[in-house]
A protein has these predicted regions:
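Domain-level signal for soluble alpha/beta catalytic cores
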Residues: 1-388
Length: 388
C-alpha cells in the first residue's frame, strides 16, 4: 500500500453514480424483467473506464471502479452468495435508525421518499441454506474492468476494489447459532477478498456494521453490544487471515442515514474496536459535522507502526464543495498527531452507495469535490514538507 511519503495522497471510499442508461438496464435486471446481459456487461465496462478516467483527471491518487456494476455496496452479494433469499415485503433498515425516525418523523417521511429513485429497493436478505461463494465470475469481471480502465490512462498511484464485510446481511433462518452463521458468511466472503488481493489491487472492506453493532438502538445493553462487536471483529479477521495487512483498507461509517444524526456513537468508542481489525489503513467520517471535532482523539490513541488513517474530508451528504484550505487544515490536524506519512485524504463515505437516478450528491458536484480534495492535499503538502 502506498503512503504519503513525499506528498499527501488522495483517495475516496468507492461508490459513484452510475450513468442513467446503465441504471435503466440494471433496473430491468433487478426486477427480473428481460434485458440484454451482453449489453449490460459492455455498459459496465464503459462506465468503469469513464469513472476511473475522471477520478484521475480530478487528481485522485488511489482510485476504484465506482461499483458501477453493483446495485448497492451491500446487496450486490445476493448474486455472489448462495444460501440467501430476499424477503419482498420486508425492507432493510438498520435498527439504530429507529430512534431518530421516532424523534424526527416528518423529516424521515420526506427522506425515505427519495429511495423511490433507486433501481431497486433494499430488501432484507434471509439465510435459508448453506452459505457458499458463487461470485467468482463476477469478481473477476470487476477486476478485469478496473485493470482495463487503468491501462487506458496514466496517473493513478494505486487502485482498490471494495467488498462488503461479513455482517449486516440480515436474518439467519438456517444455522443453529448466530456465531455459526457469521463464520459461514465470513468464510464465503474470504473467497472474494482473496481474489481481489491476488489480482494485485488493494482490498477495501466496507464495514458500517461495526458502528451499527456498537450503537445503542434502545433495545440492547452495552455488554451485549461489546460482545457482538468482538464476535464481528473475530469473524472478519478470520476471513482476512493470511492476507498482508498492507493490502487491506477498512472503511467504517455511520451508514446511509443523511439525517440529524443525534444518535451517533462517538468515534472514541469505535476506534479501539476498529483498530483490532487486521487492516493497514482505516477510513472513517470526519467531514460529517457531528464528528469534525473528533480528530483530537488521536492524541490519546497510539497508531501502530505502519498503519495509515484515511480521514473523510469530503462530506457525502451535502452538495457543498469543501474549500481546499479547509481540507488542508484537516489533513494537517491529523498529520500533527499521527505523522504526515500516515495520512491519506479521503471522503466520509460513498457518493452513490445505492444505484440511483438521483444520488444525494449530484455527480457533477462529486467531481468538483474530488478536485478540491486534490488541491487541499497539495496545499497541505506545502505546509508539511516545505513549511509554507
Amino acid at each position: 500500500m502506498q503512503r504519503s511519503s513525499e506528498r499527501v495522497l488522495t483517495t475516496h471510499v468507492g461508490s459513484l453514480a452510475r450513468p442513467h442508461d446503465l441504471l435503466e438496464v440494471m433496473r430491468e435486471k433487478e426486477h427480473g424483467r428481460p434485458y440484454d446481459p451482453a449489453r449490460f456487461t459492455e455498459m459496465v465496462t464503459e462506465a468503469v473506464r469513464d469513472v476511473v478516467r475522471r477520478q484521475a483527471e480530478a487528481g485522485l491518487d488511489v482510485v476504484t471502479d465506482g461499483e458501477q456494476g453493483k446495485v448497492s455496496f451491500l446487496t450486490y452479494v445476493k448474486e455472489r452468495l448462495a444460501g440467501f433469499d430476499q424477503v419482498e415485503e420486508e425492507a432493510f433498515l438498520p435498527p439504530s435508525w429507529q430512534k431518530e425516525i421516532d424523534d424526527f418523523p416528518e423529516y424521515y417521511h420526506s427522506y425515505m421518499s427519495r429511495y423511490s429513485s433507486t433501481v431497486a429497493p433494499m430488501k432484507k436478505m434471509v439465510c435459508t441454506g448453506p452459505v457458499a461463494y458463487v461470485g467468482r465470475d463476477a469478481v473477476q469481471a470487476d477486476i478485469a474492468n478496473l485493470r482495463a480502465a487503468l491501462d487506458a490512462i496514466p496517473g493513478p498511484v494505486e487502485a482498490f476494489l471494495p467488498s462488503t464485510s461479513p455482517s449486516g446481511f440480515g436474518r439467519n433462518d438456517y444455522y443453529s447459532s448466530e456465531q455459526d452463521y457469521l463464520a459461514a458468511v465470513a468464510e464465503a466472503m474470504r473467497e472474494e477478498y482473496l481474489a481481489i488481493v491476488e489480482s494485485g489491487f488493494l482490498l477495501q472492506v466496507d464495514d458500517p456494521w461495526l458502528i451499527e453493532i456498537l450503537t445503542d438502538d434502545g433495545h440492547s445493553d452495552p455488554a451485549d453490544r461489546r460482545r457482538r462487536a468482538q464476535e464481528h471483529v473475530e469473524a472478519l479477521n478470520h476471513a482476512l487471515r493470511g492476507i498482508p495487512e498492507d493490502r487491506i483498507r477498512l472503511h467504517t461509517c455511520y451508514g446511509l442515514n443523511h439525517g440529524p444524526r443525534l444518535n451517533d456513537i462517538p468515534l472514541a468508542d469505535v476506534v479501539p474496536v476498529m483498530l483490532r481489525i487486521n487492516a493497514g489503513a482505516y477510513s472513517f467520517e470526519v467531514a460529517n459535522p457531528r464528528h469534525q471535532h473528533e480528530w483530537r482523539i488521536w492524541a490519546d490513541v497510539p497508531l501502530a507502526e505502519g498503519k495509515i488513517l484515511l480521514p473523510g474530508l469530503l462530506g457525502h451528504a451535502t452538495n457543498y464543495v469543501e474549500h481546499p484550505e479547509l481540507i488542508a487544515d484537516g489533513i494537517c490536524q491529523y498529520a500533527s498527531l499521527v505523522g504526515r506519512e500516515n495520512v491519506i485524504a479521503s471522503a466520509d463515505c460513498g457518493f452513490s452507495s445505492r444505484a440511483s437516478f438521483a444520488p444525494e450528491v449530484h455527480p457533477t458536484v462529486v467531481w468538483a469535490k474530488f478536485a478540491a480534495l486534490a488541491e487541499g492535499a497539495a496545499i497541505a503538502t506545502k505546509r508539511l514538507w516545505e513549511g509554507a
